[in-house]
């Protein structure tokens, strides 16, 4: 990661880092959900470390801006964990604390 961010030529300005395995493990599931299965009334708690996949899908739907994606994890950029208050895209549950998503979704299903 250090080499990718500091030593390689970086013509596009993209940063490398984060939790690639979490994103890779959820990309197919998120794609199937958002492009085939979900209805407008359905809610999703995104695995916190997979927020880049969520933000990318939201960008494809027009709910996220390219500028926010380019500033991912930086001041004014898309958040590293989905946030209902800090993100411009359509976040159903803020899931910054790992494990909190499960409790929030269970509670919301009861209310």
Please place each PLM-identified region on the residue numbering.
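Cofactor-binding active-site loop characterized by glycine-rich and histidine/acidic residues
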Residues: 2-14, 20-111
């Amino acid at each position: 990661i250090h080499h990718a961010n500091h030593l390689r030529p970086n013509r596009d300005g993209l940063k490398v880092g984060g939790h690639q395995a979490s994103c890779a493990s959820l990309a197919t599931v998120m794609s199937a959900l958002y492009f085939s299965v979900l209805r407008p009334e359905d809610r999703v708690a995104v695995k916190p470390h997979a927020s880049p996949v969520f933000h990318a899908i939201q960008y494809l739907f027009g709910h996220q801006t390219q500028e926010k994606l380019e500033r991912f994890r930086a001041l004014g950029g898309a958040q590293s964990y989905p946030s209902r208050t800090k993100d411009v895209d359509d976040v159903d549950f803020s899931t910054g604390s790992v494990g909190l998503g499960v409790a929030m979704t269970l509670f919301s299903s009861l209310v």
